[in-house]
Amino acid sequence: MSSEKLFRIQCGYQNYDWGKIGSSSAVAQFVHNSDPSITIDETKPYAELWMGTHPSVPSKAIDLNNQTLRDLVTAKPQEYLGESIITKFGSSKELPFLFKVLSIEKVLSIQAHPDKKLGAQLHAADPKNYPDDNHKPEMAIAVTDFEGFCGFKPLDQLAKTLATVPELNEIIGQELVDEFISGIKLPAEVGSQDDVNNRKLLQKVFGKLMNTDDDVIKQQTAKLLERTDREPQVFKDIDSRLPELIQRLNKQFPNDIGLFCGCLLLNHVGLNKGEAMFLQAKDPHAYISGDIIECMAASDNVVRAGFTPKFKDVKNLVEMLTYSYESVEKQKMPLQEFPRSKGDAVKSVLYDPPIAEFSVLQTIFDKSKGGKQVIEGLNGPSIVIATNGKGTIQITGDDSTKQKIDTGYVFFVAPGSSIELTADSANQDQDFTTYRAFVEA
């Protein structure tokens, strides 16, 4: 039975055209399993499931008169947020994070998000395109195998790409290519003068690319596609996956600048199930394919670069980026033990990005063993979703609050509430897996 400390929420979803189609989408599977009265249209994309207090796509408390989570929080902020969270984040109406599931069939826009200072400046100058004054750090956790772009490639790889791919060389110009290749200094300690100069050179290259006329991009795209067909070996020493990737993304966004700034300049990241990456403010990134759990600060501020028909703010984009140039492996997040979670789970690990708004706890039970896990009360609100398997969830020691939790079910947990997860080991063909987004202060 629901209580005001633990209750199930029905979450809204988005049918953006980049989403996976029909029941191939994890979002669609979760939506239907959570509410079988919702029929999945096998011709429509199901892109995002939103879990939180965002007014655009509200989550509703099923057993509390279908009130929105935002209305519940607004009515009783001390109970649902806690005084420390209200004080720290300055809002008594909303969670400081938005929790999502994304199912990606087609590439999303290459984008970056401002930090808090720039977010406030952009909002003041252009509230139409920048609707709030917050930053928007994000974390992506793979639910199925995932690929994306994240941050600029290491500079030695970029130098090799500029020297090897004639079409990119043609766009940037030989003079700037030579300046970049001869000017970068490696290794360079972060913050050193060599590092500062390296970033300035990278900014010049990226700025030149992003300010190239569309006609030139179209001409060079035709040549680049021909090269991926006739001379795929050209890309062997850079990344042997590039010919297929360029052709695939060109079918989705023909003649797009993203083929150059994404495929050739950014890290192509693959995540296996359970792996994660943190997307820092002012670093370029894009999601290409797969199903992910995503958590972000509550903001809609996006500065776009490519693979989009939407507004591209090239001037601010080129000026704002950090121009960090780390390897793929450094983009991935390390996992941490979570000592406040104890019991029979084979895995209970923390994804803890270097920002205040959110962390995510993953808990997995072996399908053949079942068992019970107790997670101590947290000093802030949280949202739990089951992505595989089934079991029960309850307030620790209070059997009257015990409820079924199945794949796609989502629950809100009030601050300070210790919860108990129990895996259903009978006829379970999947490991019972939950993700829990939370904030503490």
UniProtKB/Swiss-Prot annotation:
EC number: 5.3.1.8
Keywords: Cytoplasm, Isomerase, Metal-binding, Zinc
Keyword Zinc: yes
Binding site for Zn(2+): Q111, H113, E138, H285
Molecular-function GO terms, alphabetical: mannose-6-phosphate isomerase activity; zinc ion binding
Cofactor: Zn(2+)
Feature type site, description Its modification inactivates the enzyme: C150
Protein name: Mannose-6-phosphate isomerase
Organism per entry: Candida albicans (strain SC5314 / ATCC MYA-2876)
